[in-house]
Regions:
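Metallo-beta-lactamase
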Residues: 94-218, 222-227, 237-240
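Active-site metal-binding motif and surrounding structural segment of the metallo-beta-lactamase
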Residues: 48-93
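Short, structured coil segments at secondary-structure junctions
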Residues: 9, 87-88, 111
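Active-site neighborhood of phospho(di)ester-bond hydrolases with catalytic His/Asp-centered motifs
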Residues: 41-43, 64-73, 92-96, 156-160, ...
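Short, glycine/acidic-enriched loop or turn micro-motifs at the edges of active sites
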Residues: 45-46, 75, 163, 223
Length: 255
């Protein structure tokens, strides 16, 4: 069931949290539409493709899909690239580091002229009458990692930053108990393992505090809506020890 995060009549942001069925990790897919044009955000792989295709038709036709944005290269992000390139005229928008990896998901030649490489500093992207910001989140958790900030809705689509593990229905609800969420939804453990290090966390938080964000919506699990819980999340993430901060000789022993 689609969840409308924002709708002013012309500009809409929509989340899908229950499309993954089976053994795959729960994942959220998103779309933004403005002026009749559409963009898919982290549309996933074969587990979500046909379901997302059916749902998106309620908001825009495949022929009006201008972009498929991929925050990074993981299969739960963009393994369905081949399908979208075949049935739409959309271009895939992804970090320049991953442009030559996407063809491995596709039949030969289908990506030619269909890729937009995001430079390391990020960029603006026009969609209909709106302008979206693609902002860097490098090493959170991959090199060449980007997020989408929508100034109109004030939503930050944060990819794996803020991600947690839960069922699809629960993922459609904003987090209310932050401290409980840290443990019960495995957010703390996920970030300690998947995020690169505290330096990357601190630099990212410093950048995000410069934006007017009303809602942080990750690609897995629940979201953070409202200034109070967003600040609580930023305070936690800013001091998090993770990734290489936690490595020791014990992690590099011959089995």
């Amino acid at each position: 069931m689609p969840i409308e995060l924002f709708n002013n009549g012309d500009h809409k942001c929509v989340a899908f949290t229950e499309l993954v069925q089976g053994e795959g990790i729960q994942a959220n897919q998103f779309l933004i539409t403005d002026g009749g044009e559409g963009m898919l955000l982290d549309p996933g792989g074969n587990l979500t493709y046909k379901h997302l295709l059916a749902e998106m038709a309620n908001y825009f036709l495949p022929s009006r899909t201008r972009y498929v944005f991929a925050s990074h290269q993981d299969p739960d992000i963009v393994a369905s690239a081949n399908g979208w390139l075949l049935i739409t005229d959309a271009k895939i928008v992804i970090a320049q580091e991953w442009v030559r990896f996407i063809p491995h998901f596709c039949i030969k030649g289908v990506t030619e002229g269909r890729m937009i490489a995001i430079p390391p500093k990020g960029m603006d992207l026009e969609l209909g009458n709106s302008r979206l910001k693609l902002i860097p989140a490098h090493f959170l958790h991959t090199v060449g990692n980007f997020q989408v900030y929508d100034p109109l809705s004030k939503i930050l689509f944060s990819g794996d930053v803020g991600a947690s593990v839960m069922d699809g229905h629960s993922a459609g609800l904003p987090v209310e108990d932050f401290d409980g969420h840290l443990v019960e939804s495995h957010m703390d453990g996920f970030h300690r393992r998947y995020m690169c290090n505290n330096k990357a966390c601190r630099l990212w938080v410093n950048m995000i505090r410069q934006l007017d964000v009303e809602w942080i919506v990750p690609q897995h699990g629940g979201s953070f809506k409202g200034k109070a819980i967003i600040n609580r999340f930023l305070d936690w993430f800013e001091t998090l020890e993770c990734g290489t901060d936690l490595l020791s000789e014990a992690d590099f022993r011959i089995p």
